Amino acid sequence: MPAISISEVCISNKTTSYDDDGEYGSDYIELYNSSNDVVDLSGWGVTDDKDCPYKYILSSVTINPGQAMILWCDSKIVDTSEYEDDYIIQDVHAIPFRLSGGETVVLSDPEGVQAAVAVPKTISAGKVYSFTLSEPWHYMVNDPSPYYVESFYTEEDIRCTLKEPEFSIEGGWYDEPVEVGMESGEGTIYYTTNGEDTTPDSEIYDGPILISDRTDEPNVYSAINGISLDYEYLPTDIVDKCTIIKAIVIDGDKVSPIKTETFFVGLKGEEYNKIPTISLSMSPMDLFGFDDGIYALGKVNSIHQDKTGHRHGYGYANYYKRGIGWEREAKLEYYSEEHKKLFEQNIGVRIHGGDSREANQKSFSLYARNIYDGNNAFIYDPFTHSNGEGICNKLVLRTGGEVEMYYTKLRDVLFQILASDRSIGTQRAIPCNVFLNGEYWGLYNLQEKVSECYVQEHYGVMPNDQILIKKNILLDNNEAGAFDDVIDFAKMQDLSLRENYDEIKNMVDIQSLIDYYATEFYSGNPDSFANNVGMWKSTLPGGDGYNDGRWRWLLFDLDEGAGLKTEESGADVDSFIEGNYWGEHCPIKDDALFAALIRNREFKERFITSFMDLVNENFSYDNASVILHDMAEACKEADIKSQQRFRGELTDEAYYPDLEFIPPYSEEDYERDINVVDSFLRERGGYMTKYLKRDFELKGSLCDVIIVRPDEDASIGVNTLTLENINGRAWKGRYYSDYPIELSCNPGANVLFKGWRINGKEYADNDIRIPLNNSIIIIEPMLQDK
């Protein structure tokens, strides 16, 4: 065996091994030093072409005795100048070729002595071509063991499938302890009660299992540290617990699928009666393990410390890593607020979010895939309460963002609801209690995930026929720079000219764009525009409807608005010109697209009237406060419990009410935080109406528009609004007199539209534009029974 050998080759690396930055995806070649000496690899060559043995020449790298080193076939440029002097390099990047199978990988020393490996044309996903120390001349397709050479091959047993064990009672909610029996037609039953998957090393079932309230037992997963660099508060009190039984049947070389049931015994808190509960169970090592735990600082952070001597560094922890390589299998069980199990499914779980990954309570992305249970979509739609496989394959359990998770957790969801009838995509959400491996893990919002399946479900455009951008990043493998043509056109052309404005109207859905900007402005979200922006378009040529090829906007992550940052998102902040985090110190002038569009008179009128539509209806205090307090009442006990579990003594100096916070989080704290949002909703309309006139240089005055509505079944259109269900009462809004308002009437099936009576004057046309030349405009649709 030569001193330096090629010990492992990987030609497809979606989930096989990650590099020293925690990234999957690149092919790799592993080298192994079997000698007793340190070997300097300077001048050694590696290639996939026998006729060009020094395609890549190694430099300034040594390999210690018994050490394995990986050469990554990627384009990553690494600056090693900041590495600690004693750091032993185990990763070499930027090998300038890719492996696809069928080639011969050759390693050559400076004298031309070679070691070669002929790679098979095909290797199964998740497998590599490697040798063992016992047979270094014998390469086989095997499980990966990056940075380590196995002593022997381990052969997997190929097992037939037995029927899963039967439980004597179903999981669910029980007031008193219960006994759970299990039986199978053949074989031996093995089981676990801690969330771990069952193996032949698990406990053997030999009689009924008594399940009681486990809450008084010591915390296990809630007591694990190493989950955050910034805030690792762990609860000092015991947390609520349920019992997860996982069981399999084994008979010789046969095994059954895992049967999972969750038992909630003695948990009677009001928080469990108002909102649904989700149980997530998965291998503890997949959550908190050093190498592969997605909730942990883990190996990625350890390597970063070894390299640089620094523990901190954005992105350098297991929980920061993305992609399917950092997805772990889990069992999801969903219970209604009435404690009925509505569905269960094996799914994939990843950590979700940006900076919020640093928190002790992390968000989760949930994926339905046929590799887990044969389903490529969720088998139940919690938003419509419908069974059967649909098209949604991605959901998210959100904590509420990196700051809002420690307060009300409802700001984002609130504004998504308020804007849900507008021309922007909004995410439906359901507040849920979550248990993780049997321990209470706090309040989450189960939300739709901005993804290609979201666009398909809501707009009917297939994933292969759409381009989707989120946070200025193209999702999946779509056209690079797909939105650049819109921005370039806006920057280079004078959009005040009709022909140029008409052209950009063919590129973007103007109302969708307006509704996105107006919602972000009004909510006071400082983390918008350059960051939390989503948009999509169809790529089908010559289509109509949503297939017309125009860009449309998606709304997400409004967590830091509505007064959460007193100086940036308070009710009195002029969000048209200040408060934004991302360099747009004056968004209406510095945001390239909006600044170009607002120069056009038609766009300006449409924006102003649409904005006032939202002020008068969607975001009006009468409407928004009812929704807020309904949400607050439903989540009250759950949010307080969640904050007591995760918040500890944490305060935010940018949120002025925290000056009065004394832990633990209490009902008074919750009511205070809800009142901050309530005050924002009460005051925001007045401030933004005033800023609208000043910042957009309006010359007119505010006019009261009153629509007197008779009892007939009809709906009234006011600009972009459709007013329904206002029988027998008046609707009131305020608009600037700079622009007329547009009226229309849909009289319904049982009445006839006869015209309008406006300040005593009658008009016969249904669709009309009314100038606002009086301080009060009284409008009455004239209707007659058929």
Describe these PLM feature segments:
Residues Y18, I57, S81-E84, V117-A118, ...:
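Short, solvent-exposed loop/turn and secondary-structure capping segments
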Residues S5, S124, F131-K321, W326-E329, ...:
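Short, compositionally stereotyped local motifs that mark structural "simplifiers"
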Residues S17-G22, I95-P96, T236-I238, Y319-I324, ...:
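Short consensus segments that form the blades of beta-propeller domains
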Residues L280, I303-A480:
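Conserved ATP-binding subdomain of kinase catalytic cores across diverse folds
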Residues H138-M140, P144-D157, K274-I278, M285-T308, ...:
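Middle-to-C-terminal accessory/interaction subdomains
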Residues M1-G181, G185-Y190, T198, I245-I248, ...:
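Intrinsically disordered, low-complexity linkers and terminal tails enriched in Ser/Thr/Pro/Gly
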Residues T80-V92, S212-P235, A571-H585, G648-S666:
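Surface-exposed intrinsically disordered loops and tails
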